[in-house]
Design a protein with these regions (language model features):
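Short beta-strands and strand-loop turn motifs
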Residues: 11-15
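Alpha/beta catalytic cores of nucleotide-metabolism and tRNA/nucleoside-modifying enzymes
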Residues: 1-9, 21, 28, 32-43, ...
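Short, small-residue-enriched loops and turns at beta-alpha junctions
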Residues: 16-23
Length: 152
């Protein structure tokens, strides 16, 4: 239907709406779409690292992947997936802080970047204690110091 209507590409999420973020990606359904059309199919669902992207493409025959939540935890995932040079993660987070501050002001930047820094440090050494400190942080200056000292 999409292809017949002129679509140049289709993106398919491997979970139904009722599954939201839980459960396994339905590789068979993505693969079924891939082989039912003659246009590129981009697969989405459960991509948090390069291996996830490769697995999704291998198991479905998809032409590419779309990253969603995985990019919230790891905005550097795109360089990882493509094999490109890895960015300086700390510098990237500090730039995001500066950009958010410039666009939205101190209050929003503080709340937003505490949340984002917590995402970025998940699973790292001492990340639980760091997240507690992040959420108690009450100034952009202190937040900047914490980001400069954190492991990403």
């Amino acid at each position: 239907m999409c292809e017949d209507s002129g679509a140049d590409m289709i993106t398919v999420h491997g979970r139904t709406r009722d599954k939201i973020y839980a459960g396994e990606v339905n590789y068979a359904e993505v693969e079924r779409v891939k082989y039912a059309v003659h246009i590129p199919v981009i697969a989405n669902g459960g991509i948090f690292c390069r291996e996830d992207a490769e697995n999704l493409m291998e198991r479905t025959g998809a032409d590419g992947v779309m990253v969603a939540r995985g990019a919230m935890y790891s905005p550097w995932i795109f360089a990882e997936i493509t094999g490109g040079p890895q960015p300086d993660r700390r510098a990237l987070v500090l730039k995001q802080l500066d950009d958010t501050l410039a666009l939205f002001g101190e209050r929003f930047a503080l709340v937003f970047m505490r949340k984002m820094a917590a995402f970025y440090t998940k699973g790292k050494r001492n990340s639980s204690a760091l997240r507690e400190q992040l959420f108690m942080c009450d100034s952009v200056e202190k937040l900047r110091e914490m980001i400069e000292a954190a492991e990403f």
